[in-house]
């Protein structure tokens, strides 16, 4: 009766194997390194300073979203969904990069720490470009109606 009466999952799917595969990808590893480095940088900030609290919260959010969206993109075969995740990743990576300039200007973090993070983000950007280039467009599938990644007409 319903389209979802039959299970649509793969009985051979192994979530542990999928997790190991994801964790072995260079882009996910670099995203995790950025998240860890961001956490360490945030720990050096003055917890009693309201500006530091705001900046650290935003930095942590950006750094946590990046690996989560990589996992989301890796979990699907759909080109449009992969590209949507890629855009979100780019936005948060750039936000994190921009925040390093703010922190330097506000003198909230040692410039050497910020340069380390900037270097890691640049290494991530290079991996990101290769990763996105590996996405396979399925020309037999219709677009999503928005025309952003696939011409719908």
Where are these regions (language model features)?
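Amphipathic alpha-helical assembly/interaction segments
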Residues: 1-153
């Amino acid at each position: 009766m319903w389209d979802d009466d039959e299970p649509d999952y793969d009985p051979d799917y192994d979530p542990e194997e999928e997790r190991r595969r994801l964790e072995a990808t260079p882009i996910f590893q670099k995203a995790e390194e950025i998240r860890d480095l961001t956490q360490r940088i945030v720990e050096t900030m003055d917890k009693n300073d309201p500006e530091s609290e705001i900046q650290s919260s935003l930095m942590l959010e950006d750094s946590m979203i990046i690996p989560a969206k990589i996992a989301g993109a890796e979990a699907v075969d759909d080109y449009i969904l992969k590209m949507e995740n890629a855009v979100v990743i780019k936005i948060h990576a750039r936000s994190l990069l921009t925040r390093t300039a703010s922190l330097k200007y506000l003198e909230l973090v040692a410039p050497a720490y910020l340069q380390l993070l900037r270097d890691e983000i640049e290494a991530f950007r290079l991996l990101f470009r290769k990763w996105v280039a590996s996405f396979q467009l399925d020309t037999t599938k219709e677009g999503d109606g928005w025309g952003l990644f696939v011409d719908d007409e």
